[in-house]
Structure formats: C-alpha cells, structure tokens
C-alpha cells in the first residue's frame, strides 16, 4: 500500500509591513511550509485557518500581536506561537513567557525565525 503524503506544516503569519510579509511568506513557502499570510488581526479573527504555528508581529494596526495570539488560542486549538518585534522590553518578555510565546527580535537575520518555527513544530534538526 503506498504511503500517504504528509501535509505541509501550516503557518499563520501576521505582519503589517507588506514587503516583510511578502518576503517571509516566500521564504517559509520555499522551506516547505503552507503559509496563510495576513496584514492585520481582524481578517484573521473573522475566519481563522487551522494552524500548526502562529508567527505574529507585535505591532499591528488593529490589535497588538500578543493579544491576538491569546484571542486565537481562546477559539480552539493552541498552536505554538512566535512573536516578532523590535527591542522587546522586560514587561513584554514576562507577558510572552507567561503565555508560552517565543519572541524573535527584528531584524530577522541569521535564520533565527526559521529555527524557532522548526523547533515549535517539532522539526528541529539538533
């Protein structure tokens, strides 16, 4: 009997900077992920897709990213989440830690986001 092909890991990506959203979507799809990209929280909350990992910018036009993660998790499954931001302060770090949300700092260089996603979805190559 032939093996069934496994489905790609689904990433929900929310970033209001259009060029960064496009670049991240391209890079993650090139890595084999299925990406659902959004530029704001509201459209995502209206019809959230099934997701294996959330990657969300902190500063969005209609809601902060940590609040969005908490609202999405309250709707059902609680996938791992990664918050992307610039210069997170101690208060944000504590709040993210309490919510079991990883933080990756911008600029997104050196593959840190890719490593965090792979670790979050259990595909780390240690």
Model-derived segments and their meaning:
Residues 57:
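Active-site residues of response regulator receiver
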Residues 1-12, 18, 25, 42-46, ...:
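Non-catalytic signal-transmission and effector/linker regions of two-component phosphorelay proteins
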Residues 61:
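The feature encodes the CheY-like receiver
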Residues 88-105, 115:
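Alpha4 helix (beta4-alpha4-beta5 surface) of REC/receiver domains from two-component response regulators
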Residues 18-36:
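Two-component/phosphorelay signaling modules centered on CheY-like receiver
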Residues 37-53:
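Acidic, metal-coordinating helix/loop segments flanking the phosphotransfer/catalytic sites
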Residues 39-40, 64-67:
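Acidic catalytic/metal-coordinating carboxylates
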